[in-house]
Curated annotation (Swiss-Prot), chains A, B:
Residues 155-228 form the HTH crp-type domain. Transmembrane segments: none annotated. GO terms for molecular function: DNA binding; DNA-binding transcription factor activity. It comes from the Eukaryota. Coiled coil: none annotated. InterPro entries: cNMP-bd_dom, cNMP-bd_dom_sf, HTH_CRP, RmlC-like_jellyroll, Tscrpt_reg_HTH_Crp-type_CS, WH-like_DNA-bd_sf, WH_DNA-bd_sf. The lineage of its organism: Eukaryota, Rhodophyta, Bangiophyceae, Bangiales, Bangiaceae. Residues 188-207 bind DNA. This is Putative HTH-type transcriptional regulator ycf28. It comes from Pyropia yezoensis.
């Protein structure tokens, strides 16, 4: 359809769903980059490793893992902007001035692919299916930000934590016999950082949720027993 | 460059900045739709008029005015997701289930253009400059959501209100001799709705900001005298 697209027909099936086989060989972004000989870098982050970014010229794609995105206002304070997981991207935030920068902190073992943003834009104009994939991805990014807004719109820390657990259970949970188990371990300190609180408060609230049997811990992972009952806990605040 | 794009060369200058002349004749979206004979509808909303949307099949473009986007969870509560102004869009949020819907409430006289989302996607594939414009717009949408997160990440209502006034001054303000005047009048009730509070609290906090001369009111509009001093008020909470 466009003369610049060398193998458009080849790149259509890349964006079909494929959850079997080796993870990296079926990641839609990497499949597309590899088939079209597009250069990218891979960063492997351990838990608590932090990636600083203050330029909108690169796009970071989370291949696997989870990161907290934070805006750091120089000499003042930090604001947690989002919790991103496998398939999410960051880096395409505008830069206003020198008064702040962004950082991404891994909350689990995380692999990130990094690519120049101009390369992505060029790929969009050269390959219509990739362009559609990218447009849909950007719409999904806004939706993801709105999910985070639903968590922190609560003023009460108990409501924020219950909302976060519900979102994690929905997006990063696996059904087990007595509820939904989170796919990763998460420290009280990280939970506090996400919801803008402190470790002590989070430990106290989790102890209460455990006592009232709304959650339990198994193999160091949180299990949400009943999303309905937990969501009622939010409204009762 | 692509055989489907009838007048690609013509549509390039549409996306250049043009702030002179009649507003609607130089709106980039309308210019593009009109030149390419793309159908759209215009809705004129008065203050407090509400537009319900529970489908992601249409894109709404704010031609002029301001709206609050709210997620309404059936039988339970509402969450304000964002404050959108001239040039912003909404509607492209995913629909998960029947437990909620979205509404957009005008906080000022507002004109909205509405177009089928499939038409936008088709236009993207037919016209490369429009596609680039739309991709940049979607990136901007995420950034806008992050601005809102910065406001409601505060647990204190005073900090949320001060953050909101700073954002409004930056994005919807005009420099006057003694500070930055907001471009529209806004009621205490609407301010409360945006930050998840009530009218009484907002009135009390605004009275305090007036008393300490951080803001003043002129022609029913709020003037922020010093963004620096007001931002310090946030940190002191």
């Amino acid at each position: 359809m466009t003369k610049n697209c060398l193998n458009q027909e080849n790149c259509i099936p890349i964006f079909s769903e494929n959850s079997s086989g080796d993870f990296f060989s079926c990641n839609p972004w990497l499949l597309f980059f590899n088939r079209n000989k597009i250069n990218y870098q891979i960063f492997s982050l351990k838990k608590n490793d932090t990636l600083l970014f203050n330029s909108s010229s690169r796009l970071y794609i989370i291949l696997i893992g989870s990161l907290i995105i934070t805006k750091v206002l120089r000499n003042t304070h930090k604001v947690t902007l989002n919790l991103l997981t496998t398939g999410d991207t960051f880096g395409q935030i505008e830069l206003v001035d020198d008064n702040f920068y962004y950082e991404a902190e891994a909350i689990d073992k995380t692999e990130v692919a990094c690519i120049n943003y101009t390369t992505i834009i060029k790929a969009c104009s050269n390959c219509a299916p990739f362009n559609l994939f990218f447009v849909n991805h950007l719409v999904f990014c806004s939706a993801k930000a709105y999910h985070f807004i639903e968590i922190i719109s609560h003023k009460s820390i108990t409501s924020r934590l219950a909302s976060l657990l519900l979102l994690l259970a929905e997006q990063n949970g696996t059904q087990v016999n007595n509820g939904i188990m989170l796919n990763f371990t998460i420290t009280h300190k990280i939970l506090a950082q996400i919801i803008g609180s402190n470790r002590v408060s989070v430990t106290r609230i989790l102890a209460n949720l455990l006592k009232t049997k709304l959650i339990s811990i198994q193999k160091k992972r949180i299990i949400v027993h009943s999303p309905v009952l937990l969501s009622q806990r939010i409204l009762n605040q």
